[in-house]
Regions:
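Basic nucleic-acid-binding interfaces
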Residues: 1-79
């Protein structure tokens, strides 16, 4: 599955909130800090840019997949 080319940081935050139990902890400049406790503590920083760069999006998806114990493709399909 190809990565979306027009996904904004805010859209990614919303999808991670809705589908993967991440919640916004705070903002630092143009970055949104998200955190989850399920299945273990994990914190990520999502830039609030429009659109997100492909490498940045790929790194965030890989990090979420590793923390949740699923594949990157499963995380990507939920966007």
């Amino acid at each position: 599955m190809k990565l979306p080319r027009d996904l904004s940081g805010q859209q990614l935050v919303h999808a991670l909130n809705r589908n993967w139990e991440y919640r916004e902890v705070h903002r630092v400049g143009s970055h949104i800090i998200l955190q989850t406790e399920v299945p273990r503590h994990h914190r990520i920083s999502v830039p609030d840019h429009r659109p997100l760069r492909i490498g940045t999006l790929n790194a965030i998806l890989r990090s979420v997949a590793e923390a949740k114990g699923v594949t990157r493709q499963q995380v990507l399909a939920s966007l």
